[in-house]
């Protein structure tokens, strides 16, 4: 009984509750969830989808055991523990038929002359981009703000603008990104991280600990926020 987290004769039982954004689920987390399901078929996996900011709220409300979040994330508190599991960069992509910038490097001020496609203002990515542009004395006003990186790529592909998306996403599209080019920015965007996050006052369930173990051996840093 209890939380049904005992080791039964046929393996680990219980539930794994995890929160992550669309992009993180699809382009990073899915392979780990597949492996976990194969290793522990007796564990029920519940994935709750939200922005990285929204996932912090899920964690604070004890609706999930773990979240995978972009860093930096201004919503994280001193009660959360983070383990970095991946470094990545955000890149600008566009259709060269509409934006012939291949082999060129744009100044950030020049980039502002073109329609920019970004995630919505309620995301860590938007917060990060606005801070970056502000640090170069530019006020970022996107042409389009969406809740989906996949849709941003689709709009960039048909020439509606220059989209900002994480590099690991494009590396997973298996050739579909061939119609897009990387638009080089002279002032390079700082690297960001993906991190496993849990609440220090809430002990991890046995299932959550097993999932965490997939990453802890290769974790690049441990920090409190």
Predicted regions mapped to residue ranges:
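Hydrophobic hinge/microswitch elements
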Residues: 51-56, 60-64, 70, 125-181
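Short loop->beta-strand "edge-of-pocket" segments that line small-molecule binding or catalytic clefts
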Residues: 17-19, 90, 106-126, 219
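Short beta-strand->loop
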Residues: 81-91, 176-190
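Flexible hinge/capping segments at coil-to-helix
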Residues: 79-116
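Alpha-helical linker/hinge and terminal dimerization helices associated
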Residues: 1-10, 222
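Central regulatory/effector-binding core of bacterial HTH transcription factors
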Residues: 13-76, 146
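A late-sequence structural motif
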Residues: 28, 182-225
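Secondary-structure junction motif
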Residues: 100-102, 115-136, 204-208, 212, ...
